[in-house]
Amino acid sequence: AETLFRQWFIEDADESWEEKKLGDLLTITSSKRIFYSEYVKSGIPFYRSKEIIELRKTGSTNSELYISNERFREIKDKFGSPKEGDILMTSVGTLGVAYRVRKSDEFYFKDGNLTWFKDFKGLPSSIVYLWLISNIGQEALESIKIGSTQEALTIEGLKSISFKIPPKECIEQYEYEFQIIINKIEFNHNQIRTLTQLRDTLLPKLMSGEVRVEG
């Protein structure tokens, strides 16, 4: 997907393409604040930068923090929650690590450390995501960072980034190709998740002798 994106939208980019600010193409925001007293032992995973980085690298993560299902539903009903195609990006300390939310994901996240890209207007999130993780996107992020002791990306800074808009027919064809790739990746992640759960269930039983392998 990254190779396809680079060829279509960077190497073959046309100077005549319309240029807009990122803030005009989508909503850039953060989450509602969750307080320490609201953490629970199980429920809906609550992600920080650490978990988003793990998801980006491996496709899975083990959440250490949770909020209750009731609190999550309350927030989701009033303000929304990350859904398929949305993008979360690390914005404090480790900058610019982006993760595109999958259909199977259900979680909430820490305000301040992560920035939420949603409500894409006429431009698929797949294109924005691959631009963010491309060299040209990372250079744009580098140019707007603030701070010296602890670097950060601000919502206003992200909104100000210029973005070239490919022609509609180019976007539609790319989105079709991209979705095929994403479906394959999602299938592989589900397979890995199933096998991991099976391993975690069977291994203790094998070690304790509860389950025996004949042969």
Question: Residue spans of the language-model regions?
Answer:
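Non-catalytic DNA-recognition/assembly elements of restriction-modification systems
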Residues: 1-36, 41, 160, 164, ...
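Low-complexity, Lys/Gly-biased intrinsically disordered segments
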Residues: 15-60, 69-78, 95, 146
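A generic structural signal for short beta-strands and their flanking turns/coil linkers
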Residues: 43, 63, 110-113
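A short beta-sheet element
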Residues: 48, 69-137, 147-149, 154-155
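Short, charged, solvent-exposed linker or helix-capping segments at domain edges/interfaces
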Residues: 58-60, 129, 173
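C-terminal hydrophobic structural anchor segments
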Residues: 131, 139, 162-166
